[in-house]
Amino acid sequence: MCGIFGYCNFLIEKTRGEIIDTLIEGLQALEYKEYDSSGISIQGDELKSLNIYKQTGKISSLKEEIDLYNLNKNLPFISHCGIAHTRRATHGGLRRANCHPHNSDPSNEFVVVHNGVITNFANLKALLVAKGYVFKSDTDTECIPKLYKHIYDTSIELGYNLDFHVLTNLVLKELEGSYGLLCTSSHFPDEVVAARKGSPLVIGVKGKTDMDVNFVEVEYLDQEEDYLKLNTQTKSSGNVLAAAPVKYNTCLRKSPPLRSQYLRNSTTSTFNHGSSTETPAENGLPRPMEFYLSSDCASLARYVSKVVYLEDNDTAHIYDGELHIHCSKIGSEDFSFRTVQKLELELSKIKKGPYDNFMQKEIYEQCETTKNVMRGRVDAFTNRVVLGGLENWLTELRRAKRIIMIASKSSFHSCLAARPIFEELMEVPVNVELALDFVDRNCCIFRNDVCIFVSRSGETTDTINALNYCIKKEAVTIGVVNCSGSSISRFTHCGVHTNTGPEKGIATTKSYTSQYIALVMIALWMSEDLVSKIERRKEIIQALTIVPSQIKEVLELEPLIIELCDKKLKQHDTFLLLGRGYQFASALEGASKMKEISYVHSESILTDELGHRVLAVTSDNPPIIAFATKDAFSPKIASCIDQIIERKGNPIIICNKGHKIWEQDKQKGNVVTLEVPQTVDCLQGILNVIPLQLISYWLAIKKDIGVDLPRDSAMSAPDI
């Protein structure tokens, strides 16, 4: 699963070509999430008809597929809803039948795009096959539109003409697992429903004129007396839907459709404003509206400035220019609405600009992003760190008996890099956990634990599951994320926003260094009351202020790295990376980048573990990259490097400027050194990892690998 996008226009005329272009552009904005197929669904030539176009390969292949149909792209639509999807094969292999959107039947009565995993799809599929439904794909998603059709047909037979969101609620009750989905139907023209549970969805809102909109009320569904009830006895005997008396006439479909009249009979506005009055309609008619739906707010930046984030168990229903949000779980009064938020994304930040690709752009942006994460937070004159997002939990955080950092992939490496400074400054046990393993083990969590959750997207599925687990255990939770409206930022008690900006390349580059600094700042802030650590804190704070300029110096190594990749590295397919102390995390992150981007086998090794059978492979002369910057472990690391040189290993050494210990070996051609500026030990990893980012990048370029979309790599698996 990967990217979802949808577009709805109401009383704003768009041609079919414009609608297709909008959907395609939305998918292209999601290309940074690796995918292997794509598809769209739009209205056909008739009012109650839907067409599906999908193809394996890149989005360009989808565009070619659409062009084969010779569609009338000048056909105007005053109102229309279209949905689109990019897919990374999970359930079901890479073939056209498995691409999204999926339909309920050959006439496309219901069409669905979906992110997530339906865990009971096998049971649903067996039930629907027994009812005569024919499945064309191997996916779990296909059971959703067919379930829509079955429940809809059954309700019609029983005399019930359901509203779209009521029908959706009945379908969702049958689904187990996670989902972020959009559904359109020929029975509900110009309408779309969006549902979220464990997979993100955001809705962009745009009026033809400016709107003063602050929030959208949530309409909670009654759990005791629902519109229709599923009878467990008849369900087990093969009947999916058993009708109970309808209590509320409001659940029934309005007739005639408001859409055909362009009038509204409701006395209340769907949107709620700062005052109790509605925004006046234009010329007595409903307000012309556009809605953009996506699994990632970054794809909405070019279209809207106001967005609504759906919460778990929310169902959004868009029709007649209105947005209604329903929730299947009763919430507190504090959560009886969804805030309309300003989208804080600049379009220029999601374009490549003068760079060849996004990865190169994001490597070079680290001079600026490291400033951004510290801006207004690090005061070099008073030697203080101020984190306003944590202030309300100051007492609880400083009473922590244990700190647990939980993350996945590169975010996990940033936690490992920051762990030693937490232990040193806080003087409490500090654990670093892989989110998936943490949940699998049902770890012991106590109320006096502080759990820090790190994720660049804020939507990492495993990390969110770990967060929910810790909340149930009543631990204090901190979020370190880049996306302010993400699930982790909303569900944690407090947090730090890294202010990194969009990162569209698959490889984590600028997010890693920003997370690293954010974690160091948290350690400095939490230890402020420890008098014994004052001088150490001053040293780190002063060093933080010059990190951005030092990164600029490191980037000047690029010409040397290009030459190194061209002459020495590109012919190899195995690499060893050595590090110790703070630099073991750098070795892990560097090895991860080389696997992910350069398609080479790379292994990170603790330096002193070199003698445990690892030296046996150095005779085959794989490139060995060693981190040997000055710190407490420098003498031991130097000894290990000497052993490598004795065995003709020819290592590449990342060391500090002016470090002359290997000068003679360098002159003999036994070693290559990449010299980086020296900083305090706990921050050295920020500078040391950048040469590895550049090596990974240029190795990939030399091999003609698309660095922004490497194979078999995804930020979402289903949602990382």
From Swiss-Prot:
**Which keywords does UniProt give here?**
Aminotransferase, Glutamine amidotransferase, Repeat, Transferase
Reactions catalysed: D-fructose 6-phosphate + L-glutamine = D-glucosamine 6-phosphate + L-glutamate
Looking up PROSITE patterns in the UniProt record yields: GATASE_TYPE_2 (PS51278), SIS (PS51464)
Q: Which residues form a coiled coil?
A: none
Q: Which GO terms describe its molecular function?
A: carbohydrate derivative binding; glutamine-fructose-6-phosphate transaminase (isomerizing) activity
Q: Where is the active site?
A: C2
- Example of a GO biological process term: protein N-linked glycosylation
Gene3D superfamilies per the record? Glucose-6-phosphate isomerase like protein, domain 1, Glutamine Phosphoribosylpyrophosphate, subunit 1, domain 1
SUPFAM superfamilies per record: N-terminal nucleophile aminohydrolases (Ntn hydrolases) (SSF56235), SIS domain (SSF53697)
Catalytic EC class:
transferase
Give the metabolic or biological pathway.
Nucleotide-sugar biosynthesis; UDP-N-acetyl-alpha-D-glucosamine biosynthesis; alpha-D-glucosamine 6-phosphate from D-fructose 6-phosphate: step 1/1
Q: Region Disordered: start and end of each range?
A: 266-285
Residue ranges annotated as compositionally biased, kind Polar residues, are: 266-280
- Location of the SIS domain: 393-532, 565-710
Q: Can you give the residue ranges of the Glutamine amidotransferase type-2 domain? A: 2-321
For this protein, what is the EC number? 2.6.1.16
Q: What does this protein do?
A: Involved in amino sugar synthesis (formation of chitin, supplies the amino sugars of asparagine-linked oligosaccharides of glycoproteins).
Please report the name of this protein according to its UniProt entry.
Putative glutamine--fructose-6-phosphate aminotransferase [isomerizing]
